[in-house]
Structure formats: C-alpha cells, structure tokens
Amino acid sequence: KALGAYSLTILTRGALYAVRDPWGFRPLTLGRVNGGWAIASETCALQTIGATEIQEIPAGKIVMVNDEGAQILEGAPMARPNLCIFEYIYFARPDSVLDGQLIQEVRQELGRQLAREHPADADLVMSVPDSATAAAVGYAQESGIPYGEGLIKNRYIGRTFIQPSDRLRQAGVALKFNPLAQLLQGKRVVVV
C-alpha cells in the first residue's frame, strides 16, 4: 500500500506498469507511438514524439502495457480529486493538457481573473518568466495595460522555487533573472 502523491512506472520482464495515486495529485498520460505505447507525466512529451490517442490516466488506476497492448486496471479506489495546484501555475509546460484543460489557457484565465480582482494603475505588465508569462499576458489583456518584458531569464539556471532552502532560492533567483533596468526606470509596473 502506497500513501502519498505519486505517478510512477515499473518495468518488469513481461510488462510496463504505470500507476497514478488515488487523488490524481500528479499527472500521468498514455499514448500510442510507432505501434507501441508511451507513458509520460505530461501530454506535451507525448505530442513531441508524435504519439496519438493521448489520454490522461485516471486517478487511482494502473496501466499495464505488454505484448497484447495497454489495459487500464483497477488500482486504489479514487479519492476526492486533488491535482496539485503547482502543476497549473508552475510545474506543467504551457503546451500540456491537464484535466482536459490546456495549461496556457488556464494560466491566461488566472491572469485575467487577477486583473479583475486586483486592478492596478500601471504603465506596464511584466512576468517572472517563464511560468507566469501566460498569466501576465492575461492580466494585460483584461486590464488594457501593455505587456512587455522586464526580466531576462538565464536559461541555464534550473528551477529555483523548489530549492530546499531560502538561501539557495535567493542565490538561484539572483543568477537566473536580470532586470531590464533602463526600460523599467520611472515606470509603474505590475509584476505577475
């Protein structure tokens, strides 16, 4: 019995198994590719390799892939669905689909909602790239404030939010982002 949030794969001599936790906290997807099957945490990974018949594996289910094909088996009874909110706002790529929704569209709608709930008198809307870009665009669309870049991201620095300590997070952010000070100076800026 496994308690907690997980999506996992197990490879045996006769089959490949994919298991999603009963809450659906972490995503897991299945698709057909080159006459076989592929499993990934996000739909975008399957799209990239040309997979078809892409589907999300339901919470609590086990997929068994063997020479006869792929079967969805009963696993743990599904609990109350509880996908991690960080999948929508941070972890998932914008071109992935979670719970039938394109992440890019979800993030833009969150930005529009943020603009409705927290309007601002500003000259520019900018994002902390890359996860917040779609939300910042949504904020700009809803508010009528122009969107522009204000931070340049060092693409060689990995995720900073998930570092184990504040010191490492702060050091990572300092290396990862550089503001366009000349463009921002004297402006009232909404940072999403």
Predicted feature residues:
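Short, flexible hinge/linker loops that cap or flank conserved catalytic cores
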Residues: 183-185
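N-terminal segments that mediate ammonia production and transfer
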Residues: 1-132, 140-181
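Secondary-structure boundary/capping motif
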Residues: 114, 187-188
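Structural motif
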Residues: 124, 188-190
